Amino acid sequence: MVFVRDRARREVCCHDERVSSGADLGGDGGDGGGAGRDGARAPERPSQWAARAELAERAVRARHLRRLWALPGTALGVPGWPASPAQRVFGPWNYWWQAHVLDCLVDAYIRSPDPRRRARVARFINGVRIRNGKDWLNDYYDDMAWLALALQRAEQYVGVRRPGAIQQLASALKDGWTEGGGGGIWWRLRDKYDENFKNVPANGPTAILFARLRDERAYETARWIEANLVDPQTGVVWDGLRVAEDGGIRQVETTTYTYCQGVYLGACLELATWGNDRQSRDWAERASRTVTAVATHLTVESEAAPSLVLRGQGGADGGLFAGILARYLARAALTLPEFGRTHEPAAFLATELVFASARAAWRNQAPAPRGPLFGPDWSQPAASPRTDTKAPERDLSVQAGAWMLLEAAALLARRK
């Protein structure tokens, strides 16, 4: 870890900002993250990162948020910009994208509370319920976990309550657990899809939710991931496993996604802050290990960005993956120091991963009407899309992922 930490100091902390978008939002040496006269890094400027997060918020609101079918008291995210005719009427239903936009709306309220943001959260929740058929359930367990988490945060931080929805979703997630493959919940409804896949994207956010609900199933779910889907050599979290007809494990899918690292990190942090001293230490150790694995195996370097920038995973669903990881890296940076000095290097590293990625995303934005437009790979320049292209920059997921990243940076800047 010392090597990675030194590399972070050497290559990330002293990199100057090169892009300006709005007053006092960064020019040469203007982001508060450049080198000072003695080569040390200047403190991050909370006001600047808050302003950048607000610009990302405004851009998503202006380009994507609309009333659902012109219904009063609703809002929802149009899945593409420029939007196709089907997208304009919310034909494609991207349930879990909307859950993450809701989470970002909650982030924005926490950053700068006001009645309009609160009302927007309430309208958005109404839009999700109506578009989903006046119900909360979905075929995919990971989708339901994300909506439950977003609703829970909306209640905790904004005061918009949907307790019946959270209970319904949590109950559905419990029903997804079986002993096949050693435990865990399925990726999607087994009866409908003849499912044989259990993965971290479903079990990770479920463990986070159960931990916040103080449900002991959180421990079982996270332990299942640790026992079956963490590389013992690198600490990287794998994707999932296939369950054989006899209930054994037929195959482990060892593909690595930023998404999986983020949700397992989040689960470890929740359990570390919940359990007794011994349990807390164990889960904090796993969280620190995951941060180190991310820095070592899931970052990129390019001419357009310094190292320690989180790896992009394309558009569509992949547009959210790195943003999810950034959310929980920010939590790691703030939480791990509570468990002693041995966790300070991992907390430092988590901070650097968030800020390096946020600087790169900001630097590589594309000019667009009504605010910055971000690409799916923050280490590369974004491109302005047209309606007749499949450019990932069109996707709401990609823009929400970058917004999530900038909210994480704004949170760290005001709390560190």
Feature-to-residue mapping (PLM):
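Actinobacteria-biased recognition of intrinsically disordered, low-complexity terminal regions
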Residues: M1-R41, K416
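CBM-like carbohydrate-recognition segments
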Residues: C13-C14, G39-A99, R111-W146, A154-V158, ...
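Active-site cradle of extracellular carbohydrate-active enzymes
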Residues: T206-F210, R214-C268
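Asp-box/WD-like beta-propeller blade repeats and closely related beta-sheet repeat scaffolds
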Residues: Q167-F197
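Aromatic- and acid-rich polysaccharide-binding/catalytic face
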Residues: G204-P205, T258-E270, V291, F321-I324, ...
